[in-house]
Amino acid sequence: MKISPTLTEVKEIAKTGKYDILPVSCEILSDFITPIEAMRILQNVSTHCYLLESAQANEAWGRYTFLGYDPKLEINCIDGHMKLGKLSVETENPSEYIRQILSEYKSPKFDYLPSFTGGLVGYFSYDYLGYKEKSIRGKARDTEDFKDVDLMLFDKVIAFDNLCQKIILIANMSLDAPETGYNKAIVELKQLRELLMHGEKKQNMGGKLLGEVTPLFEKEQYCDMVEKAKHHIKEGDIFQIVLSNRLSAPFEGSLFDTYRVLRTINPSPYMFYFSGTDVEVAGASPETLVKLENGVLHTFPLAGTRPRGATAEEDKKLEEGLLKDEKELAEHNMLVDLGRNDLGKVSKFGSVKVEKLHSIERYSHVMHIGSTVRGEIREEYDALDAIEAVLPAGTLSGAPKIRACQLIGELEDNKRGIYGGAIGYIDFTGNMDTCIAIRIAYKKNGKVFVRSGAGIVADSDPEKEFQECINKAKASLKALEVSQEVEE
């Protein structure tokens, strides 16, 4: 088993005093196991696990799939009540505590390793904005007690390299005592290898709907919300607002088989499954919230949608029609401007650029108008600042963002929780990759939830917007239904 880096190299890095930890790694062939099988093994030894994978817009599978289990620490906060493992504190600024924890895990980046080598995995809720924007906080009831932020710190990573058909095992070591830490990391790598090769797989990871799926807002209630929103638009209060509806049903068991189905019927750039202390999430999101890599920020606004054509010719005609739709283009341009404004809050002056405008992004069932906005993060800011600057995305709130969020709180009168928030990771190296929490199913308190929204403008038809919410929820609902018939 070849270990990288060598002990000599580790000692040299430790002498610099720049870092607290370092990723030690080895490689094994992956032809004996799949990521799904690996997750079954991890679930058998820990209730706290995650799986992150990707399918690209060109229908190719993403290069890396990341898995982890048994976190070193769980961090969450709800209404200012924060838990850091066993420690409880009251705070108006959870990000400062998260930042303090990350500051104890500074790590070098090695080019031979994948983008994620350990760090925080989980979600920041849509409502996390309330800690920074006090006018939004407390405007909505929370009947399910969803955390405002829920993150787990993983110092061991299993990375499937789908291109090279190998698994990269990573164990982060402390640089306080390099030789002791190095030897401990090697033991952990051997344990990881043994677990994957001989671990027992957990059975019965399916779930069961125990009753009818019911909406938070019936049709009449939702249409009334739309009319109220249109009044605010006509008064010049806002330009656009995204109003959501939540479907729920009694549920028992796991969402893992739901995830297995979702990744086949709706392959997406961001596919994820994780289970924590009191919540389980399965999702396939098409849209990046914000990404930070080596000091460069990206956000990729998606707005404007058409179904995929049955033939290449029909697909091309649908693309041409979408790019000529003035209403779709106007909405998209507004979101591009919002993305530029959001990145500008934490980027170096003059660095924010629209790299790509009005490209067509094709996915399994739909195509979207996509653009790319880039910025270079200022030295005084970090991944947490970038998330706070962008969250929630304009596609989940509206414009102007703050006023739209205030009205969402008043009209929906129900905290959104995970939906519309950020799901992903913050790496020990300072890099970060998060998606918008849409196309998800999540479970808590014996119930499963699916939430979706529609963008409301001045001439919106309330009944059509209600139906759009239902249509957007179909992939997650179908996955829930089909997963009940999945065989082990």
Predicted regions and their residues:
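Extended alpha-helical targeting/anchoring segments
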Residues: 1-488
